[in-house]
Structures are given as structure tokens and as C-alpha cells.
Design a protein with these regions (language model features):
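Nucleotide-activated donor-binding/catalytic signature segment of Leloir-type glycosyltransferases, i.e.
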Residues: 1-6, 59
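Structural motif corresponding to alpha-helix initiation and N-cap regions
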Residues: 6-10, 29, 68, 78
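Short glycine/proline-enriched, acidic/aromatic patches that form the donor-sugar handling elements
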Residues: 9-13, 30-33, 48-56
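Acidic donor-binding loop of glycosyltransferase active sites
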Residues: 14-27, 40-41
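Short hydrophobic beta-strand element within catalytic cores of glycosyltransferases
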Residues: 41-49
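A charged, aromatic-enriched C-terminal amphipathic alpha-helix characteristic of glycosyltransferases
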Residues: 82-114
């Protein structure tokens, strides 16, 4: 069901609580981290538009695929192996908590600024 743009995090969390995966073939932006924060693995195409968020996806917390045939196979796998993707969602949440909280990103920016200032 297409519901349009949702900016309210409570409503968004309700949708994520019912989702097994989040599939976004053409975009891998902030939705990657939002999905991971909600224990939902993110699935996208290798050439998706991204601001770098796609680099957070690895085989234990999401899937990056190459072709429409890969996506078809992936959807079949999701249907046949639900527990695999539930585990992947837990891994996504753990990754988010350990590496991608806003505090982690702020510290990375501070470290980058400090590095440049030392040069």
C-alpha cells in the first residue's frame, strides 16, 4: 500500500514494526538508517542514488542487488526464508546502535575537522 510521505516518526515506526524488509530500488539515502534503526533490513540496487548511506549495508544487515532477476529471486527468498530476514533486521538494529547513532556521526565529523586542522 502506498501511503505517501510520512514524517511523523511514531507513524513511521508503526509501519516498520509490520515490515519484514524495506525495498527501495532507486534510492538509498536516509531511509537506510531509518530502516536499520527500526530493525528492518534495507534492500536496494547497487546503482541506487545515495549520499553514502548505501555503504552501511552489508550482507548481514541488508542486501544490495544488481538486476531485476536478482530482485525477483530476492523476493522469493524473503517469502521462503522469513527467519533469515528477521535475523538480518536484528543485525541491522545492532549495527545502527553500535555504529550509526547521531552521536557516532557527530564524532566522525569532529574527528574529520580535527584531522584537517592538524595538517
Amino acid at each position: 500500500t502506498f501511503v505517501g510521505n510520512i514524517v511523523d516518526h511514531k507513524i513511521l515506526s508503526e509501519y516498520f514494526s509490520k515490515a519484514l524488509v524495506c525495498i527501495s530500488p532507486g534510492q538509498a539515502g536516509l531511509g537506510v538508517l531509518t530502516s536499520m534503526a527500526n530493525s528492518v533490513p534495507f534492500i536496494t540496487r547497487r546503482d541506487a542514488i545515495t549520499g553514502g548511506e548505501i555503504f552501511n549495508i552489508n550482507s548481514s544487515n541488508g542486501v544490495i542487488y544488481d538486476s531485476i532477476d536478482d530482485l525477483i529471486s530476492l523476493i522469493c527468498d524473503i517469502s521462503d526464508n522469513r527467519d533469515k530476514y528477521i535475523k538480518m533486521g536484528r543485525n541491522a538494529r545492532n549495527y545502527y546502535i553500535s555504529c550509526r547513532l547521531p552521536e557516532h556521526m557527530v564524532n566522525s565529523i569532529i574527528d574529520s575537522i580535527d584531522y584537517v586542522l592538524r595538517k
